């Protein structure tokens, strides 16, 4: 299912953004980045699925959205972005939120809880790494639509190849259909996010904060209402710290 998700995402990316693939070349295209992201994209999807299985939707959504903390640290240490006091407070609160979420699972000591901690950490780190590599790609002069198309195509080919080698088939019909539908949602998420940045190009903090805060809240409420998950004290504290962290960072970027 994950493999075929990137097939439909590739097609939609081509027809939506209409990338000019004539400029793609062996020497001028950052293939190492394309391949790295082609491996990371489906891998993080697998980590996400395992995290949902062992840790639940509430903690997984929070960990995923708080990956922005690592991205901001990379912005400071790698991309030399200047940090004010509010940004530093936001980073510290975000790290504290992640620790609360991870130690909610670590406290029990069971095998499933240990796996939950590992997969939450992989989701947190994986999404941040993808974000950093995407930012690095856009700074190399490659059209974002071209890079995105190549990433989706690479992710599809590598994941299909992996499935074909390990399972000797490329999926049941229902999994292929489900994957194609998932690709529509996956692409829509990226396309609408880019569109929002284009429409609000002078207010990126509004788009950034709106996406992260609302997704975390919707993820938490979905877990509580539909999946009947219990909200432990440490998770609740992590949620509050996470929302406060993103709010601080958004305000810091807008002043």
Please place each PLM-identified region on the residue numbering:
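Polytopic alpha-helical membrane proteins, predominantly small-molecule transporters/carriers
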Residues: 1-255
């Amino acid at each position: 299912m994950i493999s075929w998700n990137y097939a439909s995402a590739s097609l939609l990316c081509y027809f939506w953004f209409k990338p000019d693939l004539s400029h793609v070349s062996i020497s001028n295209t950052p293939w190492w980045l394309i391949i790295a992201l082609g491996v990371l994209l489906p891998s993080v999807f697998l980590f996400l699925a395992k995290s949902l299985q062992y840790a639940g939707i509430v903690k997984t959504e929070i960990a995923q959205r708080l990956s922005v903390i690592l991205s901001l640290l990379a912005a400071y240490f790698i991309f030399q972005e200047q940090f004010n006091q509010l940004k530093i407070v936001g980073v510290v609160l975000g790290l504290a939120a992640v620790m609360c979420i991870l130690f909610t699972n670590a406290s029990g000591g069971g095998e499933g809880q240990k796996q939950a901690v590992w997969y939450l950490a992989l989701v947190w780190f994986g999404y941040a790494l993808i974000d950093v590599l995407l930012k690095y790609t856009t700074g190399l002069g490659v059209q974002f639509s071209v890079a995105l198309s190549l990433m989706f195509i690479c992710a599809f080919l590598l994941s299909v190849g992996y499935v074909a080698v390990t399972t000797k088939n490329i999926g049941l019909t229902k999994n292929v259909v489900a994957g194609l539908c998932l690709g529509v949602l996956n692409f829509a998420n990226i396309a609408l996010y880019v569109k929002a940045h284009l429409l609000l190009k002078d207010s990126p903090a509004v788009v950034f904060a709106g996406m992260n805060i609302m997704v975390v809240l919707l993820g938490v409420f979905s877990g509580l209402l539909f999946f009947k998950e219990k909200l432990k004290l440490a998770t609740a504290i992590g949620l509050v710290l996470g929302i406060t962290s993103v709010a601080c960072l958004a305000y810091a970027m807008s002043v």
